Every structure is written in structure tokens, then in C-alpha cells.
Regions:
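Transmembrane-helix signature of multi-pass solute transporters
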Residues: 19-29, 107-114, 171-175, 247, ...
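Helix-loop-helix hairpins in multi-pass membrane proteins, especially solute transporters
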Residues: 2-134, 152
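Hydrophobic/small/kink-forming positions within alpha-helical transmembrane segments
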Residues: 25, 48, 79-83, 140, ...
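A gly/Pro-rich, aromatic-decorated transmembrane alpha-helix motif that marks the paired
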Residues: 76-95, 144, 148, 335-351
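12-transmembrane solute porter fold
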Residues: 103, 134, 160-165, 181-381
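Hydrophobic alpha-helix/TM-entry signal in multi-pass membrane transporters
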Residues: 13, 20, 36, 131, ...
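A residue-level signal for alpha-helical anchor/packing sites in multi-pass solute transporters
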Residues: 56-57, 61, 91, 118, ...
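Hydrophobic transmembrane-helix bundles of small-molecule transporters
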Residues: 94-204, 211, 237, 363-364
Length: 382
């Protein structure tokens, strides 16, 4: 996102698309685990470039009064990715695993052509500003260790190693934040985190994505191991969630222009929490319909939450810092998803016989906490 403010969001986005497409081909052609890991790592850089400036581009494309609609359309498109298990199951039913990556190539090329043709340039670029390599390295070290520590709690890692990693994180994080506080355009947007509305939106987003991943990771195991559904049936039963999100996200975008976005996000999270609780309380032998309406309820709540929350977050930042806000949005999502996936592993370890309900109950509680935080934004202004 910092590169987007310097070079232009369009350039960073198209470079990310090109890298993602090329590395998808490399993944498909990989002949060993080592080459696949290298290709996937580079693919992650491409995906990060795309995701980090996506919201900033939306802010440029849509007038302020229609920003909610733009976010809604974007959330609709993003929700298609939640149908990944269904699409993957379909691909694997007719082909081998390399096709999971090969399918990205024509999609990436098409997106690249459209990006060159239609994406706008930044209205204002940071003149005379250089990319802070030192801050980037400190950022990677700090957040990398945070994710490693979260993962370590779910594995049999010796406590002394975890404590050592925590000490290193605190040490690096302290000096990283102190350094960024002295920068006019910090890589870690300390200036944006001083805006209460922005920070509350970030925290709400983290809680929501933790809750989402608690369901998305644990529930497929329940469908296959407990209910005995095959891969295709599992993918199809997960599909109502993204479909409901696709319907509700654009609607939330329109509603966010007419009502308080904090209220709308809070209502969405309450619905989401109810959906997770209903999944946790599934009967012992549920029918497909029992599962479908509960998944749709989760997707509906998440769709109503995501669009207005993202609109509040990006709208709270100055236009010149849209890149930093967009990057923080992606960071909040990644942090929440990482924590959620790790918590699922912890639930499997602590509650081996009831891991799925435990994960969903926890997700329901976290979604409610997110709703409380969301409602606290009602009278706040950027």
C-alpha cells in the first residue's frame, strides 16, 4: 500500500496481477514440493500487491456519496472467493491439483487487460517520497513473528521458544513503532490509528474475520468426518454462505448511504452471531436444508456487516492516505483469518469430541463483541 501511494495504485495493482498470473503458471508446473513452496511464496507477494491497493482504487473510482455502493460491489466480488471450496471440489472431481492453479492464468490475463484499459491513475502521488526498506523489513519481522507465535500455541512448541519469540516481538515492535512515529508517511499507519473511528473499524474487522474463519475452517471437518459428506457435497453445502453475502453486500452498500454505517454493521454482526450459534446447535442428524438456511444466515449477516464497515474505515482516512488505509484493511483481514484458523486448531486440541460446536460458539461470542464495538461508532466522526 505504501508503494501505491508512491508509484500509483494502478501500477502496483497491475504488477501484482502480472506476478500472481505468472506464479500461478509456476505452481501448476511445479515438479516438487520445494518449487511449489517457492512459487506459492511469490504468488503471495502478487496477491498482497493486489489486495493492499484495491480499496484505495475503489475510493478513487467512486464519488464519496457512492462509496458505499462501490464497497458493496467489491464485497460481492470478494464473496465469490468464499465459494472456493465448491469450485475446488468441482475442479478436483474432473482434473488433477495443478488445474487449481492453471485456472488462475486466463482469469489473471483478462483482469490485467481490463486493468490497463480502465483503472485510473492516482489523482495525487507522494512527490519526493521513497519506499522505506528498513520499515518494510521491520514490519515483516514483527508481523511474521506474531503469526508464528499464534501458530505455535496450537502445536507442541516448547514454551521457552514461545517466550523468546514474544520477547523478540515486543522488542522489535517497540522500536518499529517508535521509528514510525517520527515518519511523515509511516509504513505502519500510526497517524491513521490515532483516528478513533478508523481504529474501531479495524478492531471490528479483526473480530469478524476471526469469527468467520472459526466457522469456515471447522465446519468442513464436521461435514466430512461426522456427517460423512463427500468433498463435492461439502463444497455445495458451504456455498449458501457466499451466495447470501453476494446478495446482501450490495444491498448494504445502498443502505449505508441512508443510515448510520455503525448501526448497520452492528446489525449485520448480530445476525452473523445468530447464524454461527444456530450452526453450533445443529441437530444430531441434520438435513441439507437444516445446514443451508443456517449457512445463508451467516452469509447474510457477514454481507450486511462488511460493506458499511469497510466504507467507514476507508472514509475515516484522509484521501492522501487511502493506500495506508487500504493496507490496514488487508492486514486486519489477514490477522483475523490467521487467528481464527489457529483457534480452530486449538479447539480441536482442547475439545477433541466437540471441537466444531466449541469453535462456532466462540465465533458467535466474538461476533457479538464486534457488534458492541460497531455500535460504539454511532456518534463518532472521522
Amino acid at each position: 500500500s505504501s508503494m501505491g501511494e508512491i508509484w500509483g495504485y494502478r501500477k502496483v495493482y497491475t504488477i501484482g496481477l502480472l506476478l500472481f498470473s505468472c506464479t500461478s503458471l509456476a505452481c501448476a508446473l511445479s515438479d516438487s514440493l520445494f518449487t511449489l513452496i517457492i512459487a506459492r511464496t511469490l504468488q503471495g507477494f502478487g496477491a498482497a500487491a493486489i489486495a493492499s491497493v484495491n480499496t484505495a482504487l475503489i475510493r478513487i473510482i467512486y464519488p464519496k456519496r457512492f462509496l458505499g455502493r462501490g464497497m458493496g460491489i467489491n464485497a460481492l466480488v470478494v464473496s465469490v472467493s468464499d465459494a472456493g471450496p465448491t469450485i475446488a471440489a468441482g475442479i478436483l472431481s474432473v482434473g488433477n491439483w495443478p488445474w487449481l492453479f492453471a485456472i488462475n492464468i486466463p482469469i489473471g490475463i483478462t483482469a490485467l487487460i481490463l486493468s490497463f484499459k480502465f483503472l485510473p491513475q492516482n489523482p495525487v502521488k507522494a512527490v519526493g517520497r521513497k519506499f522505506d526498506v528498513t520499515a518494510a523489513l521491520m514490519n515483516a519481522l514483527t508481523f511474521g513473528l506474531v503469526i508464528a507465535i499464534i501458530e505455535a500455541f496450537t502445536h507442541d512448541v516448547h514454551i521457552s521458544l514461545i517466550i523468546a519469540a514474544i520477547v523478540i516481538v515486543l522488542f522489535c515492535g517497540y522500536f518499529y513503532i517508535r521509528r514510525e512515529e517520527r515518519q511523515a508517511y509511516p509504513l505502519l499507519p500510526i497517524d491513521l490509528l490515532r483516528i478513533p473511528l478508523f481504529t474501531l473499524s479495524i478492531i471490528t474487522s479483526v473480530f469478524s474475520f476471526i469469527a468467520q474463519m472459526l466457522a469456515m475452517v471447522s465446519f468442513p471437518f464436521f461435514l466430512q468426518r461426522v456427517l460423512g459428506r463427500d468433498e463435492v457435497a461439502t463444497g455445495l453445502l458451504l456455498t449458501p454462505w457466499p451466495l447470501a453475502t453476494m446478495v446482501c453486500a450490495p444491498l448494504a452498500g445502498i443502505l449505508s448511504e441512508k443510515m448510520n454505517a455503525g448501526v448497520l454493521s452492528g446489525i449485520g454482526l448480530i445476525i452473523f452471531s445468530g447464524g454461527l450459534f444456530s450452526l453450533a446447535e445443529l441437530p444430531a442428524h441434520p438435513s441439507d436444508l437444516d445446514i443451508i438456511w443456517r449457512m445463508a444466515l451467516c452469509g447474510c449477516g457477514f454481507g450486511l456487516f462488511q460493506t458499511p464497515n469497510n466504507s467507514l474505515m476507508i472514509g475515516a482516512a484522509p484521501e492522501s492516505r487511502s493506500g495506508g488505509a487500504s493496507g490496514m484493511l488487508g492486514t486486519a483481514r489477514l490477522l483475523g483469518q490467521t487467528c481464527g484458523a489457529s483457534l480452530v486448531a486449538l479447539m480441536f486440541k482442547l475439545f477433541p469430541g466437540h471441537s466444531m460446536p466449541a469453535a462456532l460458539w466462540l465465533g458467535s461470542v466474538l461476533a457479538l463483541i464486534g457488534a458492541v464495538i460497531s455500535f460504539s461508532r454511532i456518534n463518532r466522526k472521522a
